[in-house]
Amino acid sequence: MKKKPISKLFLYRYRFIIGYTILGLAFALLLIVLPLIAQRGLSDAEIESATSSYYLGKNGILNGDLVDLPYRLLQKYSIVFFGLSAYAIKLPSILIGLLLGFLLILLLNRWFKSNVSLLASTLIVLSTPFLFLAGSGTPLIMLAFWPTLLLWLGSKIQGEKRPKPAYSLLFSLAMLVSIFTPYMIYFALFCVVFVILQPHLRFVVKDLPKLPLALVGSVILAGFVVLGINIVGHPETLMELLFAKGFTIGDFFGNIATGLAPVFSWYSSLEGVFLSPLISLPTLALALIGLFSTTKGFFASRNSIATILLVFGLVITGFNPDAVIFLILPFSILVAHGLKYILEKWYSLFPENPYARISALVPLTILFGLMIIPSLLQYIYGYRYNPSVANEFSDNLTVIRNNLTEGTVVVNENYEFYKILEDKTALTILNEQPQDATELSFLGKPESVPENYRLSRIITSSKRDNSDIIYLYTFTEKLEGE
């Protein structure tokens, strides 16, 4: 019986469809269970984000409360619908993370061959920094989401002789909404300058039909006009969109050093919400190979974009150290370049031998297994058992929801945050001791024991530094002679 050539085999013909399907299902499943394996508790930034999102109202928007508006609206309605819980706070990031993962896959698939984009996508969307973004209930994920969306939409416009007006309209709307995220005004200006300076893109734009250009220009211009009018009345909004609260120019280089510290900390653990190292050594090595490979033909848009995004990422890290997470986008592109370079070199050794080409799958599988599995384990166990990081997250909210269904809870800090619990529970949240409650619960050990109340129960947490969370006191009448 005549053997079928490899190219006719089912698994070979549909290898990329099968690969993308498995990756998509694994990624979606991972994000569904993410609340169970994600950071245990809430960081201060998540508590602040949930509080500002929930109390966001029409008057606040009209009065200039526009920073991170799209994300905060999603988070507000998530909390309103599900009630205050760690899941409701993180849900917007999980959904946006799911979309961001698929956008990264689509973007890399536009710029690279399917084999390269599949491998690079797998490495990035299952990495520790990406999973942290998708599991953190803060607007930080938007720093990676908007540029990825804009680059993908831009590639759909650039790559077509007659781009569909719908893509141009979506691009302009995305850029309009993105400017409410800090530093995205810089990215919008960066896109304009990059198109002007890049010869190929400049030629593409000149050849675009007038309708898409008119749609993009008019929508973006209208958005900047509305934002400008708002900023005139509320100049503090501009400060937050361009820099950060309390930023001074003297902080710039110190912020860069602080932001990059977890990226290159391979031998020590740093205190903060980021696990170190943020980027593993093998991933960094692939990215450096990719950076080296882009020096040939640097002025091609696909080659130069990653380097310019790296510079952009360093600049915004100077404004806010947490913005270092933006580097996940240029690193994704550089990793794809590195894989492309390695595979091309391997294939050039055996240009006519398909079996030799396929044999590269064995070392590649081992390499990727050694990169992905440790990264997943680092994420799952690092945020639970690394004290430098785990102590940055508080599980007070989860302990309250799991142990208290009704009664009065007295809190000494984050009062507005815990007050939200009253909307979906029978709890009453106060910031001072009442006089007439039959049972009192204190979040944290009270400084003084209320008169006529006796300690009846202490609710604890398994987290080391937060073992005693809630103190329950029951009212008792004074007995005669006491």
List where the protein language model places each region.
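Start-transfer (signal-anchor) and selected internal transmembrane alpha helices
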Residues: 1-33, 192, 198-221
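Transmembrane-lumen/periplasm boundary regions of multi-pass, lipid-linked membrane glycan transferases
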Residues: 49-56, 183-295
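Membrane-interface transmembrane helices that cradle and orient dolichyl/undecaprenyl
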Residues: 60, 110-112, 148-170, 177-178
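Transmembrane-helix motifs of polytopic, lipid-linked glycan transferases
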Residues: 91-111, 149, 288-290
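Short acidic/glycine- and proline-prone juxtamembrane loop motifs at membrane-interface regions
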Residues: 129-142, 183
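Hydrophobic/aromatic-rich transmembrane helices and adjacent perimembrane loops
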Residues: 134, 303-351
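Aromatic/acidic, Gly/Pro-rich catalytic loop(s) in extracytoplasmic/lumenal soluble domains
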Residues: 338, 433-482
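Signature aromatic-anchored transmembrane alpha helix within multi-pass, membrane-resident enzymes
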Residues: 339-378
